[in-house]
UniProtKB/Swiss-Prot annotation:
This is Alpha-crystallin A chain. Zn(2+) 1 binds at H89, E91. Zn(2+) 2 binds at H96. Residues 41-149 form the sHSP domain. The gene is CRYAA. Contributes to the transparency and refractive index of the lens. May act as a chaperone, preventing aggregation of various proteins under a wide range of stress conditions. It is found in: Cytoplasm; Nucleus. Gene3D superfamilies: 2.60.40.790. CDD domains: ACD_alphaA-crystallin_HspB4. Heteropolymer composed of three CRYAA and one CRYAB subunits. Inter-subunit bridging via zinc ions enhances stability, which is crucial as there is no protein turn over in the lens. Can also form homodimers and homotetramers (dimers of dimers) which serve as the building blocks of homooligomers. Within homooligomers, the zinc-binding motif is created from residues of 3 different molecules. His-89 and Glu-91 from one molecule are ligands of the zinc ion, and His-96 and His-143 residues from additional molecules complete the site with tetrahedral coordination geometry. GO terms for biological process: lens development in camera-type eye; negative regulation of apoptotic process; protein refolding; response to heat. It comes from Columba livia. One of its GO terms (cellular component) is nucleus. Keywords: Cytoplasm, Eye lens protein, Metal-binding, Nucleus, Zinc.
Length: 149
């Protein structure tokens, strides 16, 4: 449930690679909730670099907004029980000057996710979706290291 701009609606809500605005530098506009939560007065929640993790009985899913990165800028790997997502692009020009971006995310996979059946896709609007089916408790899920295309 969303509780407005004061409380993040998603655990990993972040504004990576967005740059600073003038109100970010003024102390009376800063968030009193937490020094790690950046409240935005001018951006919608849908443009905030959202990362959402879902886990139900059938599957485990990660959805990550990577709209500022091309597919060539992204790397997705499984190392043991972790998914590692890395994005980096070199300096390029935008409306406000030059900018370079980089992020690194690491998520622990549930033990019952079948790592051999994991898929990853990137939508046209920049949403990276990583999904893996869960196996019943009596079956063994495969583990190891492999890159996800």
């Amino acid at each position: 449930r969303a509780l407005g701009p004061l409380i993040p609606s998603r655990l990993f809500d972040q504004f990576f690679g967005e740059g600073l605005l003038e109100y970010d530098l003024l102390p009376w506009f800063s968030s009193t909730i937490s020094p790690y939560y950046r409240q935005s007065l001018f951006r919608s929640v849908l443009e905030s670099g959202i990362s959402e993790v879902r886990s139900d009985r059938e599957k485990f899913t990660i959805m990550l907004d990577v709209k500022h990165f091309s597919p060539e800028d992204l790397s997705v790997k499984i190392i043991d029980d972790f998914v590692e997502i890395h994005g980096k692009h070199s300096e390029r020009q935008d409306d406000h000057g030059y900018i370079s971006r980089e992020f690194h995310r690491r998520y622990r996979l549930p033990a019952n996710v079948d790592q051999a059946a994991i898929t990853c896709s990137l939508s046209n609007d920049g949403m990276l979706t990583f999904s893996g089916p869960k196996v019943p408790a009596n079956m063994d899920a495969s583990h190891g290291e492999r890159p996800i295309p």
